[in-house]
């Protein structure tokens, strides 16, 4: 009796996913950014807050800069691509005076 279906002896080789593969940060290059992001997520109780998205962007930028992930457009990652968009996001969460 064989453990392989069809009596095939060839080894099964897993294929990596197209997205979502995150190599470990063994050197701790992005630990600070990761901790700031996780603290923000904890503070807002897991909600997708705009200020946490900006911290996520910093973290992902660090990972891209240190070749821990492939470069990708911010729009593909659902994040603002320039300072104007980032300012618009923070204005959404910053209370205005006089209310």
Curated annotation (Swiss-Prot):
Residues 73-91 have a biased composition (Basic and acidic residues). Residues 27-70 form the CHCH domain. A motif (Cx9C motif 2) lies at residues 52-62. It is found in: Cytoplasm; Mitochondrion intermembrane space. GO terms for cellular component: mitochondrial intermembrane space. GO terms for biological process: mitochondrial cytochrome c oxidase assembly. Its main location: cytoplasm. InterPro entries: COX19 (IPR051383). This is Cytochrome c oxidase assembly protein COX19. The gene is COX19.
